[in-house]
């Protein structure tokens, strides 16, 4: 049966060899929060980055990319204007 | 090409929580270390606890939830693909998920 002092020495030596922190009496420190790996960047990049046509045209300063949703909207708007159901004109001051 | 506008509004909240968490993570971890260290005086620990509680509510990691990256659905999301059940099925049948094939025996 090894004595308590020898076990303590073994603990100290083991901590020195393996590069871990020496801990006596099973005391708890908050060390795990400091050692913990930061995961904010990984969590932030969960959703894939996307871009829409308006941003693309603004970025490239170009008009050649057709925006089908916008074209459809303009088509619907012209149809409504033809039927006399377009948006009302804004008041002039 | 799709914009992020196709997601549910709760997915935008999740996106906000992720950004805020990444922004305040270092401050949070350091204050947690101080608060959870019993060797420090109690006043110092309680002040660290106050600083943690003073962080914005959406900066806490418990607010983060993995939602579908296609639709923003919160349940039935496969972790490996980040997709809910139905978008997963659509992509799998269209042969767009590597390593996934329809069962046939």
Curated annotation (Swiss-Prot), chain A:
Query: Which keywords appear in this protein's UniProt record, sorted alphabetically?
Result: Mitochondrion, Ribonucleoprotein, Ribosomal protein
Pfam families, per the entry: MRP-S33
Q: Which InterPro entries match?
A: Ribosomal_mS33
Q: Kindly list the places in or outside the cell where this protein is found, as annotated in its UniProt entry.
A: Mitochondrion
Q: Does the keyword Transcription apply?
A: no
Query: What is one cellular component GO term in this UniProt entry?
Result: mitochondrion
Q: Which PANTHER family match?
A: MITOCHONDRIAL RIBOSOMAL PROTEIN S33, SMALL RIBOSOMAL SUBUNIT PROTEIN MS33
Please describe the quaternary structure of this protein: Component of the mitochondrial small ribosomal subunit (mt-SSU). Mature yeast 74S mitochondrial ribosomes consist of a small (37S) and a large (54S) subunit. The 37S small subunit contains a 15S ribosomal RNA (15S mt-rRNA) and at least 32 different proteins. The 54S large subunit contains a 21S rRNA (21S mt-rRNA) and at least 45 different proteins.
Report the protein's function: Component of the mitochondrial ribosome (mitoribosome), a dedicated translation machinery responsible for the synthesis of mitochondrial genome-encoded proteins, including at least some of the essential transmembrane subunits of the mitochondrial respiratory chain. The mitoribosomes are attached to the mitochondrial inner membrane and translation products are cotranslationally integrated into the membrane.
Q: What is this protein called?
A: Small ribosomal subunit protein mS33
Q: Which organism is it from?
A: Schizosaccharomyces pombe (strain 972 / ATCC 24843) (Fission yeast)
Swiss-Prot record, chain B:
Q: Name one GO molecular function term.
A: structural constituent of ribosome
UniProt KW Methyltransferase keyword: no
Enumerate the UniProt keywords alphabetically: Mitochondrion, Ribonucleoprotein, Ribosomal protein
Where is this protein primarily located?
mitochondrion
Gene Ontology BP terms: mitochondrial translation; translation
Q: Name one GO cellular component term.
A: mitochondrial small ribosomal subunit
Subcellular location per UniProt equals: Mitochondrion
The record's PANTHER family line, in alphabetical order, gives: 30S RIBOSOMAL PROTEIN S14, SMALL RIBOSOMAL SUBUNIT PROTEIN US14M
**Role according to the record:** Component of the mitochondrial ribosome (mitoribosome), a dedicated translation machinery responsible for the synthesis of mitochondrial genome-encoded proteins, including at least some of the essential transmembrane subunits of the mitochondrial respiratory chain. The mitoribosomes are attached to the mitochondrial inner membrane and translation products are cotranslationally integrated into the membrane.
Give the quaternary structure: Component of the mitochondrial small ribosomal subunit (mt-SSU). Mature yeast 74S mitochondrial ribosomes consist of a small (37S) and a large (54S) subunit. The 37S small subunit contains a 15S ribosomal RNA (15S mt-rRNA) and at least 32 different proteins. The 54S large subunit contains a 21S rRNA (21S mt-rRNA) and at least 45 different proteins.
- Entry's family note: Belongs to the universal ribosomal protein uS14 family.
Q: List the protein's name.
A: Small ribosomal subunit protein uS14m
